């Protein structure tokens, strides 16, 4: 289903690429609204969606396969500016009577694109004869281009690496300008959006805020809304936005599982009840959660237990709010996109999603999802627009099950206290060193391992604590953060001296893949 908006918008047709969302990110970063729709729905919704331009994504298939994802001529014949990427370029050539062949040496990784002709696609870049660093990932390649097209860029493995039909404003690239390895990829997208498609770039968080406040009022009317507040960025921004729209028709329910970071529950209550004056039900359920988790070591069982208990507690509190007919959720655009894959097939379950699930069907609450059009970075920008402190909206991601998945093995109140104290010291030292905003996520893990140590003149036998910090752009892949050694050294010394129960600190230098960011 498309979103109704008065903004100029771009339709991104998804053919199953793992980086389709990066295309949307690049378009949004340029201030242009866009949506991703699967290839088999694109022609049906294009009239309703009324895009100002179209982008065809890459994909893992081959246009030479009988069951490859395809579209007909309709999108090419609309007279709209169109940009085709990788598989999209090959499909364009196949549909418009060019030629695609397999069996050639593919290109995978960094490549050099030689610009062969002045083109609005490459305005402000290396110039004719100049070289741009791009990212290739293709096996098949175009060997003949459709009538009306000309070559504007070549590479060693792709003689038609960039082609154009200037009259029809249709451009096709064999490489991926959306990935950061393509050095001037963002500039290429801006060239397409502004120089070629003539868009204005009217997508801002200030405009979104104003429009969404009105949409919430129109949807809710005089109804009452319940919002499950976790203290995380998404639910917090959603709550503040909804409260701006409907005031005290919103009630937030904050379930303290006892598995939050140090002092986090108090901070949430202070911020929302005292600062924003949002009606807030604070449920201290720590004893319940820790009691149910006693003796549980399997990580999946932990997640499911926490999810079940959260729903039970939330359900009981929600039932006490008379007349509530709406449930607010902090659903983001990646959640919406991932629910409909281009190929329609299942993906392997690595582990249950961190965010605990929905409420029982019998509650029959209608959903209010004010953030469902936004990416995470846009949610943070909206939070600042709404007056939330940059330090709050810039906090690192925190999993729904909380510290439970940062304590491998059995969970006890004593272990939670040790981890809370150690984690707080770690994050404090990162902030003191001015490194917090350079890191995607940083946290401590209390291991189910004890080692021998010496403190004072006495032998100790206490816990090992692992420190984890990674850099990432989207959480899909991650590299370990390269700390200055003095920062790690000071952090380890403070933890061992100030947190009773830890006598050894180690640093995790595993990237993703092969590891995941969280340990469980």
Swiss-Prot record:
Residues 9-202 form the Glutamine amidotransferase type-1 domain. It holds the Pfam family GATase. It catalyses: XMP + L-glutamine + ATP + H2O = GMP + L-glutamate + AMP + diphosphate + 2 H(+). GO terms for molecular function: ATP binding; GMP synthase activity. SUPFAM superfamilies: Adenine nucleotide alpha hydrolases-like (SSF52402), Class I glutamine amidotransferase-like (SSF52317), GMP synthetase C-terminal dimerisation domain (SSF54810). Keywords: ATP-binding, Glutamine amidotransferase, GMP biosynthesis, Ligase, Nucleotide-binding, Purine biosynthesis. InterPro entries: Class_I_gatase-like, GATASE, GMP_synth_C, GMP_synth_GATase, GMP_synthase, GMPS_ATP_PPase_dom, NAD/GMP_synthase, Rossmann-like_a/b/a_fold. Residues 203-395 form the GMPS ATP-PPase domain. Its EC number is 6.3.5.2. CDD domains: GATase1_GMP_Synthase, GMP_synthase_C. The active site is at residues 86, 176, 178. PROSITE patterns: GATASE_TYPE_1 (PS51273), GMPS_ATP_PPASE (PS51553). Gene3D superfamilies: 3.30.300.10, 3.40.50.880, HUPs. GO terms for cellular component: cytosol. Pathway: Purine metabolism; GMP biosynthesis; GMP from XMP (L-Gln route): step 1/1. ATP binds at residues 230-236. Catalyzes the synthesis of GMP from XMP. Homodimer. HAMAP family: GMP_synthase. This is GMP synthase [glutamine-hydrolyzing]. It comes from Caulobacter vibrioides (strain NA1000 / CB15N). The gene is guaA.
